[in-house]
Amino acid sequence: MEKYPSLNWVKETDFHKDTADLIRKGGDLVCFFVDDNILYRKIEVGEDTITKLFDNRDVFCLSLRLGANTIIQNEYTMQECVIPLRGEFVNETFLIWDWITQCEHCRSPLTGNYAYPFSVDGHVFKRDLVEKLIGNEDDFVKIKFETPNAFEGRIWDKGWDVSVMPKKMSSFKESLVVNSPLNLVGSSENMSGQKFGVSLEELNQKYLEGFDPDLDDMDFSNIQGCHQEIQLKFKEIANVRSV
């Protein structure tokens, strides 16, 4: 906590309730991340520019994990994404496309990442839209969840009235975030660690020995998917932590 004094740390007591409280007390924009997300490029525009994107366009989300470079749906099978056939390039900054035409059914995103607007992997939303999705307090209780993946899944399972939802997704020209699934935490059944896997125990030991991931030494030169294993590199830091 001392290392990042500008962050507002919240001790988890009840993941479901904590998430709801943070959403409702937050600013006009909401973004979710999980622990294996890496922001590997700087966001070069200000909050005002992003807010104008939402205010002036029928935009559901700004995806930090998508871009013209993210053409692979599954790096383990090398399945390719279904890329939108039409779209806009706005202010030489944002790609915009119709996510509904990418979907065979809005509750079952069969066509992949470009038809999947509600993600906890670095998607930015207007807060009032997220509040609409989770519903009132009674609705929110009904979609009980204990993890980020469960939160995402329950929102999709709840079903939406597409006619009242924003029809567009957006991203920057190239992705800024990649999910590097090097191991699994919790009950997720997603594949991970097939190329550069590192166990939780190994990571913890590195931390205790005074090492941090060195993003400057990691290779982000060929990001082709939202989920892509990146080999970890470490650097020794001055203020060594120990048990």
Residue spans of the language-model regions?
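Active-site nucleotide-sugar/metal-binding loop of Leloir-type enzymes
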Residues: T19-V30
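Conserved donor-nucleotide/metal-binding helix-loop-beta segment in metal-dependent transferases, i.e.
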Residues: K42-I72
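Short, flexible, basic/aromatic active-site loop/helix in glycosyltransferases
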Residues: C81-N113
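C-terminal catalytic/acceptor-binding lobe
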Residues: D128, K132-V243
